[in-house]
Curated annotation (Swiss-Prot):
One Gene Ontology term, aspect cellular component: cytosolic large ribosomal subunit
Alphabetical keyword list: Ribonucleoprotein, Ribosomal protein, RNA-binding, rRNA-binding
GO molecular function, one term: structural constituent of ribosome
InterPro entries: Ribosomal_uL18_bac-type (IPR004389), Ribosomal_uL18_bac/euk (IPR005484)
The keyword RNA-binding is assigned to this record: yes
Function field: This is one of the proteins that bind and probably mediate the attachment of the 5S RNA into the large ribosomal subunit, where it forms part of the central protuberance.
Record note on quaternary structure: Part of the 50S ribosomal subunit; part of the 5S rRNA/L5/L18/L25 subcomplex. Contacts the 5S and 23S rRNAs.
Alphabetical list of Pfam families matching this protein: Ribosomal_L18p
Any one of the GO BP annotations: translation
Xref: Gene3D superfamilies: 3.30.420.100
Gene name of the record: rplR
Family, similarity comment: Belongs to the universal ribosomal protein uL18 family.
Protein name listed in UniProt: Large ribosomal subunit protein uL18
Species this protein is from: Bacillus pumilus (strain SAFR-032)
Keyword flag Ubl conjugation: no
Length: 120
């Protein structure tokens, strides 16, 4: 019988393949996106030192969101992570979509982060 691999297993393979080529530095950290069924998370990471510089998610108390799993929530998370990064003096980042397609919630987060001042 033919077995079908799960979408998440395929995503993890894709993410590992991309991460082998992509790394964040102190000057240009990595904006990482993780998407679950209910929430979306974004982190700005310095891979050289292994430090998370800034993070935001739909679980933050700063965001008052009714539906945390839609594109509007992802837009608010993108704005918040960009605002926090700019406050820390970070303007250039490398976008890591986490193996997800650049579509829907991931795209909404990325575009909101760009409009709020991050360059990638």
């Amino acid at each position: 019988m033919i077995t079908k691999t799960s979408k998440n297993a395929t995503r993890l393979k894709r993410h590992a393949r991309v991460r082998a080529k992509l790394s964040g530095t102190a000057e240009r950290p990595r904006l990482n996106v993780f998407r679950s069924n209910k929430n979306i998370y974004a982190q700005v990471i310095d891979d050289v030192n292994g430090v998370t510089l800034v993070s935001a998610s739909t679980l933050d108390k700063d965001l008052k969101i009714e539906n945390s799993s839609d594109a509007a929530a992802a837009t608010k998370v993108g704005e918040l992570v960009a605002k926090r990064a700019v406050e820390k003096g970070i303007s250039n980042v490398v976008f890591d979509r986490g193996g997800y397609l650049y579509h829907g919630r991931v795209k909404a987060l990325a575009e909101a982060a760009r409009e709020a001042g991050l360059k990638f």
